[in-house]
Amino acid sequence: MNYVKTLLDLYRLKRQAKLDAKRMRVLQEKKLRTMLHYAWENSTYYKRTFEAAGITEAQLDDLPLSCFPTIDKKVFLEHFDELVVPQDLCLRELREFDAAVSADRKPYKGKYHVVHSSGSTGKPGYFVYDEAAWNSMLLGMIRAALWNMSMPRILSLLAKRPRIVYIAATNGRYGGAMAVGDGIDGVGAKQMYLDIKTPLNEWIRQIKAFQPNIIIGYPSAIKILAELVEKGNVEVNAVRVISCGEPLGASLRNYLEKSFRAEVVNFYGASESLTLGVEMNAEDGMILFDDMNFIEVESGVMYLTCLYNFAQPLIRYRISDSLVLKAAEEGSPYPFTRAVGLLGRNEDILWFEDGSGNKEFLHPLAIEGFCMEGLLDYQFRQAGKDAFEMYAEISGSVSKDAIRTEMLEQMRQILLEKNLDYVQFYVVFVDEILPDPRTGKKPLILQKGETWQDEKSVIAG
């Protein structure tokens, strides 16, 4: 991203937040109809499914969005190749690329940004952004990160070249890591990645050396940094804390605000659309960016229509988050819809303690990237101060011994990186792993008391 162009485009995007609610609805509707026509003309999948639903091209201009067919991740992956618009994209080649090429921010084929979903609803998927969509998303993300800041204040902040640390799962094609890195580049700031797999003593060393003044990351990971600050292990003079990737509860928000004595921005995004909304305080709710997405809730189910990604149109795509929508009211400071009661994934962190009382954590996303033939799904549960279990669902055609061997190799490496080689790791084979019926998401970490009774094998420790 060109620095000057980024600032000019950001200024234009910020101006849209000053529209009144009526003009925002007109803008959103115009973008929606453009996307519907584009999908009809360029996506084999959408034209076929629209026609199957009895929708004609003439109706694309005025038929309510609720009349259009919905899509979920399963259908999306099954029909990936006929849904995407570019002819040089196919799911098989994307999976080969993901498996063969080490994850970095370089675009696939030099022009596509491939986001690997974290799999909180089951099997991981791939979401593709072309350069135009990626840049639109980055501008929305920058607008959210600097929410409630005037352009003069933003220019003053950026002139000092802020030092930004991103604390999350950085080793993979996770949208957050890729987007944050490109966004920081776009505003000319200094950056440091702090992976959740890094041992705590290394956290302390790197934070002391880098001295960040803006913190971005999972709230569960930022909380650990706040605790290090509270204990006096490190000193952080932050001007802004940006929480993303997990829900941010009111109590944790208060704790982070007090610990860092800084504004806390709660950023909302998903792999399907990395820029969905922003929240500055829990009482007002989450502001949803109606100029970038069209979000519906029907019978408690959320559907997303992304208005800026024309390479991979997502129209009425089911998202497993749970929320209640509240339309912008007359006199509201912003023209956007608000989400009340947003429920998304909020993983527990696994904490372990060695015989000398030294503690170390393992974030669930550090152990979420398992990929091996025959392993269909998995969950984790802590079994003690120095042990945890993995519940594995495998296909009937593979050997349990083969899964054990591969799992042993991968997990030992992860535990070694975190100085957790003393931790015992078990595998439990189960028939099926199902999502939580309340949220529709698969909890990666089972709570205490939630167990499977099945075959158990010690494979590490």
Language-model segments: which ranges?
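Nucleotide 5′-phosphate-binding alpha/beta core
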Residues: 1-116, 123-144, 151-154, 159, ...
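Residue-level signal for inorganic ion chemistry
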Residues: 39, 117, 164, 215, ...
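AMP-binding/adenylate-forming
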Residues: 130-135, 139-141, 163-221
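Short, hinge-like loop/turn segments at secondary-structure boundaries
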Residues: 183, 232-234, 282-286
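Short, structured coil segments at secondary-structure junctions
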Residues: 187, 237, 259-263
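Adenylate-forming
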Residues: 195-202, 212-253, 266-272
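AMP-binding/adenylate-forming catalytic core of the ANL superfamily
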Residues: 215, 315-419
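Conserved AMP-binding/adenylate-forming
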Residues: 248-330
